[in-house]
Amino acid sequence: MNKGLKENSTLLLTNGDVVHVNQLLGSGGQGFVYSVTVNGEELALKWYKNRPSAIFYENLQKNVTEGTPSESFLWPIAVTRQKFGSCGYLMPLKPNDYYEFSQFRLAKVRFSSFRAILTAAIEMCNAFKQLHAKGLSYQDLNDGGFFINPRTGRLLICDCDNVFPHGENSGILGKARYIAPEIVMGKNMPDSYSDRFSMTVMLFMLFCIDHPFEGYNVVRHPCMTEDIERKLFGEDICFMFDKNDRKNRPVRGVHRNALTIWPLLPKILQNTFTEELGKKKLASRELRLTEMQWIDILLNVRDSLVVCPHCGDEAFVNRESASCLNPKCNVPIEVEAWLESDSHSIPLIKNNLLKVGTSGCIIGRTIEKPGTIHILLIQNLTVKTWKVITPSEKTVIILPKGYFPVKEGMKVEMTTNDTTIRFTINK
């Protein structure tokens, strides 16, 4: 086993560029991570404790050549030549304001808002959608595999060296608590289907902080063995909020996060997690939601998230209920109208920002007309003109920064930088 690199030592990349090793940043099961300098640019170097196989090394070089599928990946950008009985690869350094997700689980770092959590969830799904679209699978997603900016929710996924084509294996099976039950039981090798399971586990943990399968079943086994782990995360895996099986419920005093947050989640999220982590889809991998289906659900949730006009906290509003996330606020939220399209249903209340797309692009905002009560205006915050068709079929052009009143039956064509979305205003 390689003991690592010394500070101020040098390496060569496969293209001949010189790597100057600065300092050790951390280490894990596979290797060490150093800050390094290449041609005046500071980067990160992962150096393997054991020399990877020839197949692994060739695949790493191939991933470097083809480039990252998404900006959300800290993707390999160069590979070193073999030296000291091992090798490594370069990747971008993570910014200082990004923290490993395990820090959130330990409450050392907290999200600034629920909207930031939603942003992280959407970015994760979008990154894996683009990865899988290139015929690749990540194979080893776990709570140490990504970093998040707690203020914005922007997300970076690391450890991308295990990415292999779908159906091929990197030699890394992943952690039993995060890999799909069929992998734990040895029925399949990691692929895009098992990625979707791991992604769903991480999404649940983003929202609820606790692990979806670590309820009473795990608490009653303080000494975890391989056989017990195989049973709890493979043969007899059970979601802590399974609709029919109560044997793995969260334990009071232990799973405070899950018990507190789960009741606050919108029904669409609760129902999706219950279905995706339920017995049927645990056993039938091909039935798992795709990344795009997850994105549609998360965008639906984001549409329903508003600022409570009474307390200023976040609130979920849909046609069935209007619940503020602040337990001290019990004032009902009145929705004046809904801005609806085939894929959006946005509640119109005062001081609400209108966002679309996976990036959460702000296209407009609602304000109360000065000197009035309950008369809302929508402002165009894009650089494009919008077209409004009134109930009397009159067409009105709304310039950037312009306003129009909210009236039932209006049809609105909102143009952003790259698309036009057709909305109808309904009561």
Language-model regions: role of each:
Residues 2-39:
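ATP-binding glycine-rich phosphate-binding loop
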Residues 142-181:
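Activation segment/activation loop of eukaryotic-type protein kinase catalytic domains
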Residues 195:
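Conserved catalytic-loop aspartate of Hanks-type protein kinases
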Residues 203-270:
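Conserved C-lobe activation region of Hanks-type protein kinase-like domains
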